Amino acid sequence: MAMIRSAGLHGFRALVAELGGDAGDIAVRSGLPTAALESNQMLVSDAAVAVALETAAHELSCPDFGLRMARRQDLNLLGPLGLAVKHSESLATALRYVSDFLFVHAEGLRIWAVPDPLGSPDVAGVEFDAGPGRVPTPQSTALVLGFAHRAAVELVGGPYGLRSVELPHDPPDPEAYAAYFQGPVRGGRASAVIRITGSLASLLLREHDEELQRLAGAMLARHRRNPADDVVQQVRTALSHAMGQAPLTLGAVARQMSVHPRTLQRLLASAGTSFAEVLDDLRRHNARQLLVGTDLPIAQVAQRVGYAEAATFTRRAHAWWGTTPMRVRHGAQLS
């Protein structure tokens, strides 16, 4: 179970009350202590937070609940991380701080820069992932992406070149989402990504302060990520580089990382996962991205994610999505 600081619930009680609900009741039924609604520093289950957001959205008939929560939160909730982000030189530097130190506030969440999932060379992507083997819920995704969007506008001092927002699910309220992001919002995608025109490094921040950035960075450097979590990311990176080009085996990755295979197995187990789970999660992610974002033949998609035969890939697709790769692609095109 991944933990998250209760700052992620900031504004929950007030918003639920405005909508005519009982925040304490929803919290308890979702597995959260009511004290978490009054503090920004408690560690609570991220799964329970996700349940609370979905419950509130459903019971209060508020499909854009996550976006409304995002409007009530700002970078000050992130402490030293917020300071480092705010006083960075560019959006690229700010995003690196988030990628490296978001674990201080949310163990499982990952946000990082990626190439454009639709393949445009002049577009950058900022991707949100709930972690290996975890599927982000619509309201949690809205809260994270909504927060990131508002922060980017504040940091840059205006529009930052948002091209589109890609979601792994249909937007619960298309009009509200389009109005919030001031751009196209599309569902049925491989992952949650904000697409941005141009280079993130070229987007300079209006409150850049080298000394404050250095001091905030020094405070963040005192925090140490769980070594096992680092191993998961290292394995994922090694597999990404080898996928479709080299054997995707525990032994091959262990050799690349200069550790014994059994040691690597133990480290992954201590992170609550396994080599097979990390590989399967990466294959699923990459396969959906290729199906949705390209027109590569199915056999070539299979090869790109490490399957020698399209039939094997198709069987695995049924396990992931309950349907065939072609139907995944067709469904995305219709969305």
Question: Can you say where each PLM-predicted feature lies in the sequence?
Answer:
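Conserved active-site and cofactor/substrate-binding residues in soluble primary-metabolism enzymes
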Residues: 7, 21, 143, 230, ...
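Short amphipathic alpha-helical face segments that pack within enzyme cores
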Residues: 11, 143-147, 286
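Short acidic/histidine-centered micro-motifs embedded in hydrophobic/aromatic stretches
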Residues: 29-33, 168, 281
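Hydrophobic alpha-helical core bundles mediating ligand binding, dimerization, or RNAP-core interactions
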Residues: 53, 145-148, 220, 239
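N-terminal regulatory/effector-sensing and dimerization cores
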Residues: 76-200
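Extended mid-to-C-terminal alpha-helical interaction segments
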Residues: 170-335
